[in-house]
Amino acid sequence: MAARFVNLDRETPMFLPYDLREWVPADHIVHFILDAVEQIPTEHFSVNQRGTGSEQYPPTMMLALLIYCYVTGRFGSRAIEAATHSDVAVRYLCANHHPDHASICAFRTANKAAFDAAFVTVLQLAQHLKLTKVGTVSVDGTKIQANASKHAAVSYARAGEMLAQLELEVKELMERAQQAEAQERPDALDIPAELTRRTDRKAALQQARAVIEARAKELAAAQQPDYAAKQAKRQAQRDAGQKPRGPEPKAPSETPAPKAQYNFTDPTSGIMKAGSGQHFEQSYNAQAAVDAAMFIVGARVSVAANDKQELPPTAAAISPVVAPQVTAILVDSGFYSEAAVQAVEQNPDGTVTGVTVFAAVEKMDHHKTVAELLPQPEPPALAPAATAKEKMAHRLKTAVGKELYKLRKQTVEPVFGIIKEVMGFRRFSLRGHAKVSLEWTLVCVSYNLKRLFSLKNLATMA
């Protein structure tokens, strides 16, 4: 008996109009995204209110298109445009319309307010469904590649060397021009073009050095409160007849480091360690605050290569929807400084905020011996003269501190893993700190909706 196969006929046209809803399962995430986006107030979208020009695509459709494509790993505007033709769920979402890549890109860069509103709306929806667990929040940062090559950068020292070389070359070209004019015969070089090229290059290098110098001053100003606090504490110890321990704190310097970098393609990005410090990439430091249910409750982007100054601004970025419920913030040793902890735990007037920081004061060994895994007694009481660092280390050794701090790695780090490995987001599509920040918000909204969809399905099945 001959093998039998299903007859495939790709040439016969459909005689009746097709219903796109029949092509997308009822439990598909695209339905959930459309329902969620419809709850965002329309006043947050940037649209042409005059009604002139061509008809606009509905802003809720455009936002749902971006979110669905980010959830499914398509971030470039051309890839998203292609999905409107090839992806059945996207065709359903767009009702068989096909926004071009220019419209998609323009909508993405013009709607920061809508992305911020979507972030709040999704958290409110999660709270309404009682899926958030906000009392304890973990804060961390991850490096996301910039849309720029590290080879398009120059260091502060190298820029100075190149400026000196350009000065010599300009002088040489001017001398050749004078000789050619005196001899009344043209030079072999196109001297005006060469002078213009070097003048433009000089201006770019001077701007690079000016930006690096401004960054150094800004960093020194940010480090000054921590330095002043350390100096005041050491002086208080001297006044009490005690010898301060440890080396003298180094005063913040406004002089740029010779290796400080400026990138010509994306000037606000920086060279940062990546891959567990194994290599360097042109990147941004994407920060997130994550609750115990693995929802991102606060997000921002930093241009700093490390997290030393990032705890206060990232804690301040926690959405007002959940901020009043936060009682504890967990961070690793990279975030710890006395000034950073004080900024989170105390208001400017000295009153307490009600938030307690649990921070490692040094890198912790994740391998535990059998003895360390067994229940441990409470640590002995601190000495009255204990430093802030000793107090924080003691806080983490208490039963409460241990129980809370072990949640850090299993909340915020898996979120970054899902964003990078499952969603595939490892590189920003936009350039400049402002645009990168709005794209990170869009990524976090997309992640939160994906997380909410998963938890909602699990709750339904239970």
Regions found by a protein language model. Name each.
Residues 1-3, 7, 66, 73-86, ...:
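Anion-binding and metal-coordination hotspots
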Residues 1-31:
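Hydrophobic alpha-helical membrane-insertion signals
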Residues 24-67, 72:
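Basic, short loop/linker segments at the boundary and entry of helix-turn-helix/winged-helix-like folds
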